[in-house]
Amino acid sequence: VLMLDDIPVEEVLTPRSVIFFLNKESSVKEVLEKHNNIEFSRIPVCDNGLDNIVGVVRRHILLKSKAEDQFDIKIGELARPIHTVQEADSVGDVLDEFVKRREHMFMVKDEFGQVTGLITLEDAIETLLGVEIVDETDSVVDMRKLALDNWRKKRWKTQE
């Protein structure tokens, strides 16, 4: 039996190095011109980088704004607040928090208040089931593996 209370969030989070985020000052037009096919349904919104998270925007809100010709709206105006958990919190506690708050994504911080990643409801359920949930829109199956691969490539280049 898998004990979710024994697994810390830091073991299952999506690392900050592979988080796709948007700047709060960008307009809907700028975002959609630069990223014409956003694959994530929920996107963190920041003010000058990941250490200053201001909220989360849902992809469908961006597309709705586009459909309503609201191209000049700033992403920060569309963002909703996002809850933060600690990387030492258990996946079990965070799963309970997802259910209680009716949310699907939380930012994760370390003991110093630095953003270390994010965790989704899907991450918690995958941990419970012990398998990756992959749907037709996933271009990357495992974001933790992607972060590790990127780190290895960068390290290899610096050693050359």
How would you describe each model-predicted region?
Residues V1-E160:
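Cytosolic regulatory modules rich in charged/polar residues
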